């Protein structure tokens, strides 16, 4: 019981002090089936203890409804105390069917996206949000939704 309390305290410290950053969100591909969004992930650990963190699963929503998520991974990282660690790039394939309510707004933008990688998802002008889920020291954590900029 004491062990679980210690682990929960560690998760609370992660929640309060650590910062997960999504860096360089971008459109990487536009196809007939949908579009691919990618972002680089890093974690700041300002605490004095190391953390074991799973690779985050990023979920995209539009208008509060599920659109797509990244593929879960068993990959884990040890985040050293008082450091920023890069966790790599996460890619999410968003099918056009998830964007159907917004297709009239997208039709005019799609030609400008084809063949141009690296554009910000903000170019889509859609109400897209993301949140991530991650295990920290074997305890589950889900972030609050944030608008994709």
What are these regions (language model features)?
Residues 8-20:
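Proline/serine/threonine-rich low-complexity linkers at boundaries of modular beta-sandwich domains
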Residues 20-29, 90-95, 149:
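N-terminal low-complexity, acidic/Ser/Thr/Gly/Pro-rich segments
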Residues 43-50:
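Asparagine-centered strand-capping/turn motif at beta-strand->loop junctions
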Residues 59-108:
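Intrinsically disordered, low-complexity Pro/Gly/Ser/Thr-rich segments with frequent PxxP/GP/PP motifs
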Residues 94-149:
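Terminal connector regions
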Residues 51-57:
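Short coil-to-beta strand junction motifs in C2/discoidin
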Residues 1-9:
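Single-pass alpha-helical membrane anchors
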Residues 33-40:
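Short, solvent-exposed loop/turn segments enriched in Ser/Thr/Gly
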């Amino acid at each position: 019981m004491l062990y679980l309390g210690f682990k929960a305290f560690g998760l609370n410290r992660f929640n309060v002090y650590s910062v997960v950053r999504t860096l360089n969100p971008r459109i990487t591909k536009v196809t007939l089936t949908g579009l691919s969004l990618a972002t680089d992930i890093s974690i700041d650990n300002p605490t004095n203890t190391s953390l074991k963190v799973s690779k985050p699963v990023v979920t995209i929503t539009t208008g509060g409804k599920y659109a797509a998520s990244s593929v879960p991974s068993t990959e884990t990282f040890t985040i050293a105390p008082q450091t920023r660690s890069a966790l790599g790039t996460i890619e999410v394939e968003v099918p056009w069917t998830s964007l159907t309510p917004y297709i009239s707004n997208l039709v005019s933008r799609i030609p400008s996206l084809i063949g141009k990688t690296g554009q910000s998802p903000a170019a889509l002008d859609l109400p897209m949000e993301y949140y991530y889920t991650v295990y920290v020291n074997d305890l589950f954590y889900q972030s609050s939704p944030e608008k994709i900029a």
